[in-house]
Amino acid sequence: IQDFQKFFDETFVVLCGDALVDLDLTEAVKKHKEKGAIASLITKKVTRDQVSSYGVVVSDENGRIKAFQEKPSVDKALGDSINTGIYLFEPEIFNYIPSGEKFDIGADLFPKLVEMDLPFFALPMDFEWVDIGKVPDYWSAIRNVLQGKVRQVEIPGKEIKPGVFTGLNVAANWDTVDITGPVYIGGMTRIEDGATIIGPTMIGPSCCICE
């Protein structure tokens, strides 16, 4: 963000691009400002057996961040609130980010804010958050969208029958195929007579589904 510093003249949000979220940003910014924070980090609780897959955020009773644990083992984790990769900053944050050199938000900036005891807060929020850092996570995200579990994210395409959505120019005789939704079929895909598709399933474009 150093390269775009001149554009940030008010509260701004930085987020990782490998997650599917439906966060209420207006509410998040409101909480950030109420705390008088120079930086805030959106957190989410996970089950105890999941903490080893994420960065754990340790904060006091007021939400002030005191420490981080990067993918700790279950027995060593100091909490179950994790870093979602969604951050809110005030422009003054650049006073603590050196220009012209590599400086990582998580590895360099956040420990510096904690060490200097600056107003750096964890903001627990109730929202849908699906990490898509691995292939199984990507499939999980697709499945959740197809099953309507992700608020404000609709299945694209045309619904040709309940729970079955298609892109453009899908070739199929719908009376001779067995499809149980939720299913999305990409454009230009051909489905042969007698084929069976059971959801939740997403089929990419230009595929051929045989009997």
Q: Which residue stretches match the model-derived regions?
A:
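Unchanged
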Residues: I1-L146
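Left-handed beta-helix
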Residues: K35, E92, Y96-E211
